[in-house]
């Protein structure tokens, strides 16, 4: 569960991200800016997901750091984390990059970084191909270059996620 909050008063909250490694229900509190924070709370199999999105259960977790007078819930949403790594990123005139080619759990913060690296590796190749300086085979090398990197980060993110989600 993620909960985005807007604050009137943030005196008791730090300007950095905090991980609470609770054995039963880990919580991450992310610094967004001076007036906003995101809370990420693990949903347990025994939890009623529909009930969890209501404000009363949410405030139960938020009350550890804030109260209703100092903050407003702007958004709450259930997320599922998973890993996806496509086997083929290039076919005919279609080239995959970023989340369409690979999806990483958020535990290392490398998902968008990997997408940016994909685009950087692809941009000069596409320019060369468009100007007839590179062949379609040269475009295909893009996956061979990027695949080992994203594969390693996805595996590492999944392992870090196991530690953070099951600290006991």
Language model: regions and residue ranges:
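Core Rossmann-like FAD-binding/catalytic domain of the broad FAD-dependent monooxygenase superfamily
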Residues: 1-168
